[in-house]
């Protein structure tokens, strides 16, 4: 039996294949009860928020059942609330007690950014279907409300139209600027220096994710990120640094979202009971430092702080998870390829070489 780690992607899983993958899962008869619970939980969340908040943060609504049965509106997944809900629903569907969640080869879980909550669900390993469905509902409510509160807290991260137009003249891909941007090819030392000089002017750009030795992500207001880009444009060009705005509408892993993490605590009575770390049946690893969450004090606090506020140190997290749990196989639970790609690059730098396979491959073998 190969010691197996379940790996969950973050909002990088919001790609062209997410909708088709979610629609395929929804069409399977064995997932009927699960999706019934998903739709009911989302209806409860929307009722809880009220019409004014719904219109503010979800202008297209979130009728997931109708979208899966007929079609998603254009750009629906550009809203990070919608994207995060879809990513989480996709990931947790694979953890039902009759499927991979019950496989004894699985000995640990690790989630990139918002994928942490799916990793926690995997680690709790409910054995009965009713327990799983109750956990899935509370987990989806936690994720959805965290995204809503994050969106509300980030209300001031809009962009200066002149800076946006100036940037789009340079970006051949035409990706709309937002509150997170990825840099590839710049050393951490040089990036810290550039950020320090920029932030001394009273602006606020923060390093939110160190995904691999070559890929880092910044968070801040869209205007600040654009201004930072133009302040360093010549250096980026000379050093062949690639800059790319992410499709996120929320600046994850930054101090901008500290108020959101606090606000979700006020929503917990609605969210319902969430098991504590003593209920984890296997290691679930943190992403801010080499830690096993079985030794934490509160899984909700861990999710809120690690996803909304604290930066990710993926190389340290991935290396610790693989070594600590003696992992021989990593199962990529998707829905996107980002977590797998970053993990492979980080482990290559550390000399580790576990086998990687997709959740679909693992699923076929488990039947």
Annotate each PLM feature:
Residues 1-106, 266-269, 273-367:
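Acyltransferase/transacylase module recognition
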Residues 7-9, 113, 184, 208-210, ...:
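Short beta-strand segments
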Residues 12-13, 114-117, 222, 250-253, ...:
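Gly/Ser/Thr-rich loops at beta-strand to alpha-helix junctions
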Residues 18, 121-123, 261, 342:
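Short, function-defining helix-loop hinge/capping sites that tune catalysis or transport
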Residues 73, 118, 122-125:
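Surface-exposed, active-site-proximal loop segments in enzymatic domains
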Residues 91, 107-115, 119:
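Gly/Ala-rich beta-loop-alpha elbow adjacent to hydrolase catalytic centers
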Residues 123-298:
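Alpha/beta catalytic cores of group-transfer enzymes, especially the acyltransferase/condensing modules
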């Amino acid at each position: 039996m190969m010691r197996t780690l379940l790996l969950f992607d973050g909002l990088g899983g919001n790609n062209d294949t997410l909708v088709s993958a979610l629609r395929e899962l929804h069409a399977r008869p064995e997932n009927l009860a699960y999706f019934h619970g998903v739709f009911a939980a989302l209806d409860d969340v929307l009722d809880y928020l009220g019409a004014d908040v719904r219109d503010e943060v979800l202008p297209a609504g979130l009728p997931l059942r109708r979208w899966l049965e007929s079609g998603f509106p254009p750009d629906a997944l550009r809203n990070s609330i919608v994207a995060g809900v879809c990513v989480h629903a996709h990931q947790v569907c694979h953890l039902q007690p009759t499927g991979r969640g019950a496989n004894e080869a699985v000995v640990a879980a690790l989630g990139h950014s918002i994928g942490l909550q799916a990793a926690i669900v995997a680690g709790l390993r409910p054995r009965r279907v009713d327990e799983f469905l109750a956990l899935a509902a509370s987990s989806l409510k936690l994720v959805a409300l965290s995204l809503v509160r994050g969106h509300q807290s980030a209300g001031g991260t809009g962009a200066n139209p002149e800076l946006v137009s100036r940037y789009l003249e340079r970006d051949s891909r035409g990706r709309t600027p937002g509150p997170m941007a990825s840099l590839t090819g710049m050393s951490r030392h040089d990036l810290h220096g550039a950020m320090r000089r920029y932030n001394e002017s009273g602006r606020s750009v923060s390093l939110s994710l160190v995904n691999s030795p070559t890929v880092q992500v910044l968070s801040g207001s869209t205007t600040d990120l654009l201004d930072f880009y133009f302040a360093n444009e010549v250096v980026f060009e000379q050093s062949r640094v690639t800059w790319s705005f992410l499709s996120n509408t929320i600046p994850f892993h930054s101090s901008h979202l500290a108020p959101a993490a606090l606000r979700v605590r006020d929503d917990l009575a609605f969210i319902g009971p969430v098991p504590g770390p003593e209920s984890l049946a296997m290691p679930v690893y943190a992403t801010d430092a080499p830690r096993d969450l079985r030794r934490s004090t509160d899984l909700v606090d861990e999710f809120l702080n690690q996803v909304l506020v604290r930066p990710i140190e993926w190389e340290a997290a991935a290396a610790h998870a693989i070594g600590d749990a003696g992992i021989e196989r990593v199962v990529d639970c998707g829905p996107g390829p980002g977590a797998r790609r970053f993990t492979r690059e980080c482990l290559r730098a550390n000399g580790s070489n576990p086998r990687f396979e997709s959740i679909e491959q693992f699923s076929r073998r488990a039947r």
